[in-house]
Swiss-Prot record:
It catalyses: S-adenosyl-L-homocysteine + H2O = S-(5-deoxy-D-ribos-5-yl)-L-homocysteine + adenine; S-methyl-5'-thioadenosine + H2O = 5-(methylsulfanyl)-D-ribose + adenine; 5'-deoxyadenosine + H2O = 5-deoxy-D-ribose + adenine. This is 5'-methylthioadenosine/S-adenosylhomocysteine nucleosidase. The keyword Magnesium does not apply. Belongs to the PNP/UDP phosphorylase family. MtnN subfamily. Homodimer. Its EC number is 3.2.2.9. Signal peptide: none annotated. One of its GO terms (biological process) is L-methionine salvage from S-adenosylmethionine. GO terms for molecular function: adenosylhomocysteine nucleosidase activity; methylthioadenosine nucleosidase activity. The lineage of its organism: Bacteria, Pseudomonadati, Pseudomonadota, Gammaproteobacteria, Enterobacterales. InterPro entries: MTA_SAH_Nsdase, Nucleoside_phosphorylase_d, Nucleoside_phosphorylase_sf.
């Protein structure tokens, strides 16, 4: 099995990259792909860049170049669920765009023409992630993750997301674009991210302060998940 891993930022991939043995690096379309073995398992780690277009481009390049069997999207996220705090884990059961609106033509809010309203994560990957969470004794929430090209740092944007997606547990800027590409390629995916901030008017301050905490936690989760997927 070859496992694809996608993170947007240098801070979100550096700890995993340093753990890859026999590492080789290739740059495609402004994205960096690192291939090798993570604890003996073949992996391809992509640093995509921030935002939906960068994430979709990166996911496509990773799937075409490295041909992984599954995709894990890692990194940080803003917490929406009331039980979440910095360092906690969110696992997707579905991903949706929070900034797409074609409702004038009868689509659900967040749905694009020709696409489902949401992109479902793979049940086996979800189960494996939840098993890792239990083993590591981490606080985690599973649910809807929403994505858009905005860092949510104010009451207006937050209120809009809560209104349109009351069940959303986290918000970030890449996951749904990655899920969209995986849907088109028919490749299983799951989003496993750590909370860097609670989406509110001070979230930019929290993000800067706690990104390293989120990166450490998400790296731990992904490393454990890769082992579980490789060895059952």
């Amino acid at each position: 099995m070859k496992i694809g891993i996608i993170g947007a930022m240098e801070e979100e991939v550096t700890l995993l990259r340093d753990k890859i043995d026999n590492r080789q690096t290739i740059t495609l379309g402004g994205c960096e792909i690192y291939t090798g073995q993570l604890n003996g398992t073949e992996v391809a780690l992509l640093k995509s860049g921030i935002g939906k277009v960068a994430a979709a481009l990166g996911a496509t390049l990773l799937l075409e170049h490295s041909k992984p069997d599954v995709i894990i999207n890692t990194g940080s996220a803003g917490g929406l669920a009331s039980t979440l705090k910095v360092g906690d884990i969110v696992v997707s059961d579905e991903a949706r765009y929070h900034d797409a609106d074609v409702t004038a033509f009868g689509y659900e809010y967040g749905q694009l023409p020709g696409c489902p309203a949401g992109f479902k994560a793979d049940d086996k990957l979800i189960a494996a992630a939840e098993s890792c969470i239990r083993e590591l004794n981490l606080n985690a929430v599973r649910g809807l993750i929403v994505s858009g090209d905005a860092f949510i740092n104010g009451s207006v944007g937050l209120a809009k997301i809560r209104h349109n997606f009351p069940d959303a547990v986290a918000v970030e800027m890449e996951a749904t674009a990655i899920a969209h590409v995986c849907y088109n390629f028919n490749v299983p995916f799951v989003v496993v991210r750590a909370i860097s901030d609670v989406a509110d008017q001070q979230s930019h301050l929290s993000f800067d302060e706690f990104l390293a905490v989120a990166a450490k936690q998400s790296t731990l989760m992904v490393e454990t998940l890769v082992q579980k997927l490789a060895h059952g």
